[in-house]
């Protein structure tokens, strides 16, 4: 089992940290599936849908995350990591709920 991460840009909010692949906007499952396919991945299975909110001093993020099983490697910017790889990367606390879920999934055998 592996999970996809990508490094955020070197400038801006959460610069240089790691994040889960994402797109801006409110997406339902159909739109989320289309976004995944636009990355060159095929959705095999949908496992879960998690919502989260993170408040920065100047902006509020409301997020919906989908846990998927996919086929393909996707764009070169994606790095597929196991549990040790996830633990070795700096993922912002804004994604804490998703980090814990990813960690739990990766540690399951």
Question: What are the roles of these predicted feature ranges?
Answer:
Residues 1-109:
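Intrinsically disordered, low-complexity, charged terminal extensions of DNA damage-control enzymes
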